[in-house]
């Protein structure tokens, strides 16, 4: 475990990430917390090792995490257990005054350990609902929303969902999405990107697809059907389809 020097001059905040979308969405929030709080960044490693995520930290100019849990297990239950166990060890060491999490992946379940330790939980992207318990994230988001101290929603619809479920209005704040700040901050870098040239593409003349959900890619038959559909789309519109291959899909 890392050696950490703890001071008392600023509020001590822990932010936990575990997936690449979380890293992207929180990139500017992390920068602000680094400036104004005593901030510790934790990566669960729930899906892949740090090296597979390192490109995102480098591209987004985010510092390396202070802690890396390496929580990936042989199945979802083992991973969730590891996430909670390792988070509790880190919370015991750091004694944070607040926890920030975003979204509904298994990394958000560190909130269970935080709740046990009475650490205030701030949950960004709260209140999203699909009303389908076959979706693992639907279970996660219901748990996390209901144990968080402050739920930060992207929309009025998400806020209404939480109110209907009985959460107090004074614990729900509509903030909007952090992607506005992310896109504004990186717009020059995006504009100067050479990716289209590298892939021999013309702007607005291609389809971009990313598929990683287990219900789409874990079944060879369903994945084959998806690929066949993409081929039909490409042939119909005479445009290439670029598939951003998620490690889960590649495997």
Tell me what each language-model feature is.
Residues 14-17, 22-29, 56, 68-168:
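Active-site and donor-binding regions of nucleotide-sugar-utilizing enzymes
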Residues 46-51, 70, 147-222:
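A nucleotide-sugar donor-handling region in carbohydrate enzymes
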Residues 13-23, 212-224:
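Short, glycine-rich nucleotide/cofactor-binding loops
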Residues 47-63:
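N-terminal beta-loop-helix "entrance" segment that forms/cooperates
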Residues 239-251:
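Catalytic donor nucleotide-activated moiety binding site of glycosyltransferases and closely related
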Residues 15, 41-43, 101, 123, ...:
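Structural beta-sheet core signal
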Residues 222-238:
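Short hydrophobic signal-anchor/transmembrane segments that target glycosyltransferases
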Residues 1-46:
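N-terminal subdomain of nucleotide-sugar transferases
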């Amino acid at each position: 475990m890392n050696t950490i020097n703890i001071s008392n001059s600023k509020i001590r905040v822990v932010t936990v990430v575990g997936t690449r979308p979380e890293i992207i969405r929180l990139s500017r929030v992390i920068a602000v917390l680094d400036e104004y709080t005593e901030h510790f960044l934790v990566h669960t490693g729930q899906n892949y090792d740090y090296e597979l995520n390192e490109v995102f930290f480098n591209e987004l100019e985010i510092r390396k995490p202070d802690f890396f849990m390496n929580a990936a297990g042989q199945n979802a239950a083992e991973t969730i257990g590891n996430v909670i166990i390792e988070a509790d060890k880190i919370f015991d060491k750091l004694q944070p005054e607040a926890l920030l999490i975003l979204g509904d992946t298994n990394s958000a379940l560190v909130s269970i350990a935080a709740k046990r330790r009475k650490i205030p939980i701030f949950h960004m992207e709260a209140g999203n609902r699909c009303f389908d318990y076959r979706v693992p994230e639907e279970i996660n988001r219901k748990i996390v929303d209901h144990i968080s101290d402050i739920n930060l929603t992207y929309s009025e619809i998400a806020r209404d969902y939480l109110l209907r479920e009985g959460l107090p209005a004074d614990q729900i704040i509509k903030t909007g999405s952090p992607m506005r700040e992310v896109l504004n901050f990186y717009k020059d870098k995006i504009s100067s990107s050479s990716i289209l040239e590298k892939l021999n593409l013309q702007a607005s003349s291609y389809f971009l697809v990313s598929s990683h959900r287990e219900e789409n890619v874990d079944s060879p038959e369903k994945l084959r059907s998806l690929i066949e559909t993409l081929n039909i789309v490409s042939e119909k519109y005479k445009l290439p389809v670029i598939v951003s291959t998620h490690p889960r899909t590649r495997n």
